[in-house]
């Protein structure tokens, strides 16, 4: 296979990477015929990096940094982005935090200026802390009022117990209420340093021009002698057994999530696991959707989910149904999981699931924002860019035999589960569910 030269158009379009002093990485992907540009500062710190006493600090800080900098108020920041019709936002996850902007390519210098100012110079002023504390508490209350969102946090806590990935990203009303300005400032100073950061951009972007902008705005933070932090490995160990959690609530429906612990994203059978998840409950033709909804009409919403972290993961099933149908939903769900664990999926199901993964991957990367996100996550998680073509090849190499071996290995494990609905005690829950949790 010939090497790509700089004159080769394919080589010119390949993602580029520069490591600056201090360990800050800049990765870009130029997309021809795209007028927009997306840029994000990815920080390799998330909710799993907090101590239990400051649960929610990463998310609280993400809110707080937008309130003011030494040269801009929150209104100044908002008006500057509104004036160019762009988007400026952020999100916090278990293992990272991202501050990003989506603008016209010609407005990229402004976007870099704003994002860098927020990330590096957010003031954490005392008055701002109290105002934003109330905002976060309202967000927690809103999440608790949404059964599906509340159940997602309950399930991970039931599955992982005291392990950091089992704690809600948003924290709790109790932890956020007592968090101090000093704790938030300490978190910012310790973890928001260049070696923990990746600046990723995609779209109408010039790599060398972006590197120059980053040098300008990160300035004195780029101290020589530091190297990028290696991709996260995690502890590799989750103590304790999964459990069953019930929250009794007067509601029209019963909501349930149940699932198993899996290896993390670096597992050699990671894509076979993704195929298994897709065949189980990842689409309209999946086993669970067909058996629970289409054939029996027991629930409107039923699906599977796969969450992968550095050292662990969760394969789960979610369903919502009328309380009187809960036992039937659990009976059918248990039958499907037992059948797949025992007999596996078919060659046809494997092919459909692989096609769904391939199509979803490519269709989900047709804009600059999604490309930027892929660049940032790949750099933080793996320390390098993983091309779309590489991922597509990995999916294509999955065989039905590998998927079924993964199913036998994982689906016989002890399950964790969370239930939210009008049920008075765990003893009143379906026997099939209690048996799976053990």
UniProtKB/Swiss-Prot annotation:
GO BP terms: namely: proteolysis
MF annotations from Gene Ontology: metal ion binding; metalloendopeptidase activity
- Please list the residues that bind Zn(2+): 59, 63, 139
Cofactor(s) listed in the protein's UniProt record: Zn(2+)
What UniProt keywords are attached to this protein's entry? Answer: Hydrolase, Metal-binding, Metalloprotease, Protease, Zinc
Top EC category: hydrolase
Q: What is its EC number?
A: 3.4.24.-
Q: Which InterPro entries match?
A: Metalloenz_LuxS/M16, MPP/UQCRC_Complex, Pept_M16_N, Pept_M16_Zn_BS, Peptidase_M16_C
Q: What is this protein called?
A: Uncharacterized zinc protease MT2852
What is the scientific name of the source organism? Mycobacterium tuberculosis (strain CDC 1551 / Oshkosh)
